[in-house]
């Protein structure tokens, strides 16, 4: 239905002054016209605060032609509209037959029975919650007041500032259009403003005379347009450091689905972060373009909901789209201190939390990958309404444990598994950031498994992804692990040495990896581990391995008040390596646990596949020169058998050592064939020396008699 409302103001002139007595309303609904005359007094009663004087001033019908011409000349006009033929995707899928229709304003327990029940949310109540705030969409300030009529309405917005308040960006949006406004205050105090408007052409706001959209539109395709609103002076100023590729910006905004577009923006933010864009944002084209794209990501979700009219929006689509927005909201908050108002539905959050309450978290890892991801997205979206006793950490840990048990040793994560674990990681991040978790053992297991997955090959794969700008650099278990030994030099030694990779890109990737770690350092802190209180100097901690009943703290000094102290004392170890088991979370009474114990060696490691005698133990490998390599947590007989039947132990490398960490706090070195091979090598060397010496003596004797 298309509704066209035209208000005609009838002015009665009395004694040289204008007064408003009535409003004539013309309605044209799908070709059927109706006319109404409403007395002004009745309209004022229905709409209190409506000022005829303000309407008169806003209309500015008495503006002379010279002023209008001057206003027109000030506003920037595009050299021409770029017409592009673009395919617009069908974003929201059709609702399956029999889906339960849920009103966002009337969510109650039992409205949906479980994850397997198809459901959708009614569009109108949902849209109302997403655009709940009332604010000024089109301000009465220049240059906007030259082009638009002032507009206050229901809206949402994304706002951030850089360099104090000297540079601001606000992306204000309704379900119909988005206006992204850049505002910069120069050192001289001059203010420059530029706005980009995106939306369906027919839904863009009305313009003041004498403006028309063709002169302001930069790009157009089918239903959508991208418009620039600024003055020639302001445009010239912004053009010094902001030269966006409007064709690419517009094409992506039109052709990508809401969820995929949000993921694209998230990937851009990670790459910006690699370059130090969070710590010291540069006012350049890339940063400013990304700001606009962040607001487009939020707009596309709200716009898609609004486009369904009085329909119903599939719950799985909502879970996926709002998960992406939640992740995006978190990273721009951490990176730029950005504020997001609106684009949040308490009804959706409540429904997601209720659905998760029907799931047995400890069994989440047994579901199909599709259901795991759906549940974890719901967990993230519903987190604000779930409460601290929801057990969501247990669900994320169950999924990670399932992935770990079937993951090949020392292999980087494959694409599907990386995506699933990325979704689950956000539940963990939420509880870590809020410091409210009641899931200590599950959280410790989650971080232990993440540490075990943070192998050299995994690190190499992530560095490759960061260097090439692919999604494999977006997430790694390393970011939530308990590894604190990853320095720049160490990461460079783990980086892939490929001819196709530019070394400068690899170096930037290493910086980006470290940037991710520093950004998440608070999240990766060990505050929730009971053994945390036994550590006096966190900067000396290299790794933490929390097993059942005992937590091993690996450090570069002896200042850990553990139950015992072991030292990895080998000839070529470039830096000290101490292992401090903290049994039953009890710190030693003294300053440290005493003199280091010698690590006993197992010469013949028993290879058994009949029972899991090593379940609950951990294996830690280290290089005498490079330090810690990786750890493996033995969770099941399958993992144990995989270790024993594979090339896990590289005993040919005499500089790599393997330590077995047990649940009673004992540390043993698995020498395997190391000592035997060393003796063989030594015997061969001695035999060669003896043989050479014999030849030499024979030569001397022969020469003596000659």
From Swiss-Prot:
Main location per the UniProt record: virion
Compartment annotation: Virion membrane; Host cell membrane; Host endosome membrane
Gene3D superfamilies xref list: Herpesvirus glycoprotein H, C-terminal domain (2.60.40.3190), Herpesvirus glycoprotein H, domain D-II (3.90.380.20)
A single GO BP: fusion of virus membrane with host plasma membrane
Residues listed as glycosylation sites in the UniProt record: 60, 435, 549, 604, 664
Region called Interaction with gL, residue ranges: 165-229
Organism: Epstein-Barr virus (strain B95-8) (HHV-4)
Gene assigned in the entry: gH
Protein family membership: Belongs to the herpesviridae glycoprotein H family.
Stretch forming the signal peptide: 1-18
Listed InterPro entries: Herpes_gH, Herpes_glycoH_C, Herpes_glycoH_C_sf
Primary role: The heterodimer glycoprotein H-glycoprotein L is required for the fusion of viral and plasma membranes leading to virus entry into the host cell. Following initial binding to host receptor, membrane fusion is mediated by the fusion machinery composed of gB and the heterodimer gH/gL. May also be involved in the fusion between the virion envelope and the outer nuclear membrane during virion morphogenesis. The heterodimer gH/gL targets also host EPHA2 to promote viral entry.
Disulfide bonds: 120-312, 278-335, 454-478, 534-587, 612-615
Protein name: Envelope glycoprotein H
